[in-house]
Amino acid sequence: MKQLRKFKTLTAICTIALASTNFANADEAWQRAAGVGEFAPATQDWAAIEAAAREEGTVTIYSVSSRIAKLVDSFQERYGIEIVGYDIASDLQLEKLRREHNAGVHTVDVLFNSESSILLNEALPAKLVWNFIPESVSDELTESEKSPLLIQRHSSRIVYYNTMLNPNGAPINSLWDMTREEWSGRTLLPSPLEDSLSANFIQTILANPEDMAAAYQREFGEPLSYSEAVIEAVENIATIDKPNASIEWLYRFLQNEPVFQGSTTKIFKNVGDIAQENPPIGITTFSKLRKNKKGVYAAGPIYDLDPIFGVTYPTALMIADMAPNPNAAKLLIRYMMEEGFSPWNEPGDYSARESVEAEQVKEFDLPSFEDLKLWPVDAEEIYYSKFSFLALYLELS
C-alpha cells in the first residue's frame, strides 16, 4: 500500500495554530511547575513528589483497561490518594483529551493508552501528553520502551480456538484458512470500522504482502492469482499502486462473512464455550487467556499460525498536558510500573520490565515475548495509511 503523504490532521493543526499567547504562557508555567519536558529535574525527589501528591489528593486517569479499578483501594490505602478512573478506548481517550484541551477544560492527569499511531503522530508532537520515566524502573527498560513514551506492557491481538473440542490441536494453521468455505461465518473479531486495534491488526497484515504471498503458496501449493474484485478496487484507489497478497487475503476474508462483535471478552467466551458442537475461531486480545474457566471456557492461542501468531502493540503511560494533579500522576505512573502492575500480571500481557517478564514466562509457562512470532504495529505506517485502508476496506466489503 502506497504511503499517504505525511500530514497532520486538521484538529491537531488547530490545537497549535489557535493557541493564544496567554495560553502558551500558562502552559509553560504548568510545565515548569509539573517538572516535565525541558523542565524535568536531573534527579527525581520522590519524597517531595509523594508529599505534593498527597496534598493534591486525587488523580484522574483515562484507561484503556477496565482493570484500573483494581488499583483504587490499594493506592488509596498506601498513599491516601483517590484514583478516579475512566475505562475509555484508546482512540476515544485522545479525541476526548483533544476536545477538552481545546475548550480549556483540564481534568485528566494520566492516560493509559494503546493507540500508538495517534499518540506518536498527533498527541505527542502537539504536546497534549508528556513522557515521564520513573527512575526506579528505567534500567529495566529498553530505549524504545522509554522513548518517545513509557511502555508499561506489550499486548497483542491473536487468534484463539476451542481446545476442548479440538483435542488434536488447532483446526487452522494459516491466516489463509480463514478464507476457506468451512470457516464462512465462523471467524469472530471486533469490527475494524469500530475498533481501532482491530483496524491496526488488519493494517499490519496489509503492510506485509510478501509474507502473505509466501504463506499462500505454502498453504495451497501454487502462486496466488488476484480476484477481479481486488484488481478493480485497486484501480479505484489512487493511493494503492497494485494488487498484492494481503489485499487479496482481506477481500477473501471479508467475502467469507466474518462475524463482528464489539466485546473482546465476548469473542473469547464464544470461542471457548465448551457447550457447543461447531466452535468458531476468534481474533481477540492475548490476555483474554485469563478468562478460561474449567468446565465452562477452554480456548487457546494458535502459536504456530502462518505467517504470524498475531500483531503486537505497546500500552503506554503518560501525563496529560495541564494535568491538575501532576505529582499524583507521577506517583500513579510509578505505582503502575511497580507493584501496581498486578492487575495486568496475567498470561498474554507481557511487562515491559525485564525482570517481571522473566517471572511471567516462568509462572504462566508461556514463550518469552521475543520468541513469539508477532508483527509489531508500525505507528507511522498505520497513521499515514489509515484513510487508504478505510477506502480499500469499504471497496472490498
Describe the function of each predicted region:
Residues G310-D378:
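Mature extracytoplasmic/periplasmic domains
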Residues N25-A52, V230-V234:
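N-terminal low-complexity, Pro/Thr/Ser-rich intrinsically disordered segments
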Residues D139-T142, R153-R157, W249-F253, V296-D321:
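Periplasmic-binding protein-like
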Residues D27-A42, E370-S397:
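Conserved C-terminal helix/tail region of periplasmic/extracytoplasmic solute-binding proteins
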Residues S117-E122, G272, E277-G300:
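A ligand-binding cleft/hinge motif common to bilobed small-molecule-binding domains
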Residues Y62-D73, V84-R98, H106-K269:
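Extracytoplasmic ligand-binding site segments that recognize negatively charged/polar headgroups
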